């Protein structure tokens, strides 16, 4: 494990196990480790209990599959490939097929771009290959069903968005849809038609993935607010979204979760 400069961290034994380590310092004259105070049993218990409580809440209101989707999506949004490796394993062990995990990563490119989506897919490929080399053959699963609707893609996407958001398809356009009409067309045709019509994930699962991806991206509170509202319209409960943010906080940190928790609380108060 390599620790970046100026990162305060602890290491040592847990309450029920011992731990030994060798610290290697480069350039010890100018880069010497600064040893701080020991961590007391009370401090250790407080920190670990907080994490356990967050996951306990998630376990109460989110299935293991939903928790896996949240973790995969948020790490992908952030571009944290190192933590994605273990997260992919947990997703597969939670019963997700290879194609279903891939679908989360494919969905992600609409919200965090092709580079992070593709890097996550490449990382997932290596995880699957390593597991196969170790005699673990993960279930590939079915492909997405063929889309038989030959209707206008813009209108199909418009109708999907109206269904999941509860906002009339005939609502007047505003904001970016007027300023850059082509992006609004791409959103309807590609995101809400081409992607949302793929049936490897439900609408609910896609929206859980979406808000998690946005959490990982950071700094996109207005988009998070819109999609959190869609989640609520689809029947996802406030406590489920709160548990989602607990997972984000545990995995990515409070700087990723807290701005969104403020937005979520404001949204819930208006309901």
Feature map (PLM): residue ranges:
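Double-stranded beta-helix
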Residues: 10-51
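Amphipathic, charged-and-aliphatic alpha-helical interface segments
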Residues: 67-78, 205-220
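Acidic, glycine/proline-rich low-complexity segments that act as flexible tails and inter-domain linkers
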Residues: 51-66, 75-94, 100, 116-203, ...
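Substrate/cofactor-recognition hotspot
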Residues: 103, 107, 112-115
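Short conserved catalytic/interaction loops centered on acidic-Pro-aromatic/His motifs
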Residues: 220-229, 242
């Amino acid at each position: 494990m390599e620790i970046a400069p100026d990162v305060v961290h602890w290491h040592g034994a847990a309450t029920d196990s011992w731990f030994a380590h060798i610290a290697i310092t480069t350039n010890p004259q100018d880069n010497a480790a600064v040893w701080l105070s020991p961590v007391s049993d009370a401090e250790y218990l407080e920190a670990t209990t907080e994490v356990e409580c967050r996951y306990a809440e998630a376990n109460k209101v989110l299935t293991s599959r939903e928790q896996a989707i949240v973790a995969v999506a948020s790490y992908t949004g952030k571009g944290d490939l190192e933590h994605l490796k273990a997260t992919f394993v947990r997703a597969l062990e939670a019963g997700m097929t290879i194609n279903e995990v891939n679908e989360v990563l494919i969905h992600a490119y609409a919200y965090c771009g092709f580079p992070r989506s593709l890097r996550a897919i490449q990382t997932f490929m290596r995880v699957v290959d390593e597991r196969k080399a170790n005699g673990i053959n993960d279930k590939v699963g079915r492909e997405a069903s063929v889309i038989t609707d030959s209707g206008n893609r813009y209108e199909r996407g418009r109708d999907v968005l109206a269904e999941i958001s509860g906002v009339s398809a005939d609502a007047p356009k505003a904001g970016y849809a007027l300023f850059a009409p082509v992006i609004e067309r791409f959103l309807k045709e590609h995101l809400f038609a081409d992607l949302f019509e793929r049936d490897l994930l439900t609408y609910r699962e896609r929206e859980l993935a979406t808000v998690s991806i946005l959490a990982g991206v950071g700094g996109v509170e207005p988009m998070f607010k819109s999609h959190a509202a869609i989640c609520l319209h689809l029947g996802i409960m406030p406590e489920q979204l709160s548990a989602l943010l607990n997972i984000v906080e545990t995995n990515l940190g409070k700087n990723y979760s807290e701005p969104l928790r403020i937005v979520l609380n404001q949204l819930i108060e208006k309901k």
